[in-house]
UniProtKB/Swiss-Prot annotation:
PANTHER family: BIFUNCTIONAL COENZYME A SYNTHASE-RELATED, DEPHOSPHO-COA KINASE-RELATED. This is Dephospho-CoA kinase. One of its GO terms (cellular component) is cytoplasm. It catalyses: 3'-dephospho-CoA + ATP = ADP + CoA + H(+). Belongs to the CoaE family. One of its GO terms (biological process) is coenzyme A biosynthetic process. Keywords: ATP-binding, Coenzyme A biosynthesis, Cytoplasm, Kinase, Nucleotide-binding, Transferase. It comes from Francisella tularensis subsp. tularensis (strain SCHU S4 / Schu 4). It is an enzyme of class 2 (transferase). CDD domains: DPCK (cd02022). Catalyzes the phosphorylation of the 3'-hydroxyl group of dephosphocoenzyme A to form coenzyme A.
Length: 204
């Protein structure tokens, strides 16, 4: 799929890698439109038809006040890779359709597509992305960030990280990799500016 008005760039990274900070910098400092898969997912899971399907899979107790209990759902997919795969396989097509729609409507020269779960196993569905930026950080840094940011203990932090694919897997689809282990936000911003400039030069 080709987009006439914009150049879609994927960004991904594991939990607590600093990917969200990088995305915010691209939006606020570089004035690029951002399409966020997580935001789209939250909106989609508010739809009655989707709520019904998820309840059929995981039980009516997953619904609270006519909405998906996201904390309960998160706990289920943390404990079960099968449940996580089912949820991703079910939600993926409709999320991807909305991502494409929003990218098509974007009015900036480049559009950042924030997809936390992007990897070799599903990249064929996102082959419209012209470049992919991977944000990574070493394991101990990510564990520390999760413990400080979310109040998790070490075991919980490791469990969350292990649910996701490894940085090594992510790097298989990367055009650019930024190691955010020890970067300040200002240093991260500088790296991102350099990366976007490189992409701009490649497209000219």
């Amino acid at each position: 799929m080709n987009f006439i008005n914009t150049y879609p760039i994927g960004i991904t990274g594991g939990i607590a890698s600093g990917k969200s900070t990088a995305t915010r910098i691209l939006k606020e400092k570089l004035n690029l439109n951002v399409v966020c898969a997580d935001t789209i997912s939250r909106e989609i899971t508010k739809k009655p038809s989707v709520i019904k399907k998820i309840a059929e899979k995981f039980g009516d107790e997953i619904v609270m006040n006519k909405q998906i209990n996201r904390a309960m759902l998160r706990a289920i997919i943390t404990e079960s890779k099968e449940a996580k795969k089912w949820l991703e396989d079910y939600l993926h097509p409709v999320i991807n359709k909305e991502i494409k729609k929003q990218v098509k409507e974007s009015d900036t020269v480049m559009t950042i597509v924030d997809i936390p779960l992007l990897g070799p196993y599903n990249f064929r569905h996102y082959d419209y992305l012209k470049k992919v930026i991977v944000i990574k950080a070493d394991l101990e840094t990510r564990i520390r960030r999760l413990m400080e940011r979310d109040g998790k203990n070490r075991q919980q932090a490791v469990a969350f990280i292990n649910l996701q694919i490894s940085d090594k897997e992510r790097e298989k689809i990367a055009d650019f990799v930024i190691d955010n282990t020890e970067l300040t936000n200002q240093e991260l911003e500088s790296k991102l500016i350099t990366t976007i400039n490189e992409i701009t030069n490649l497209t000219n």
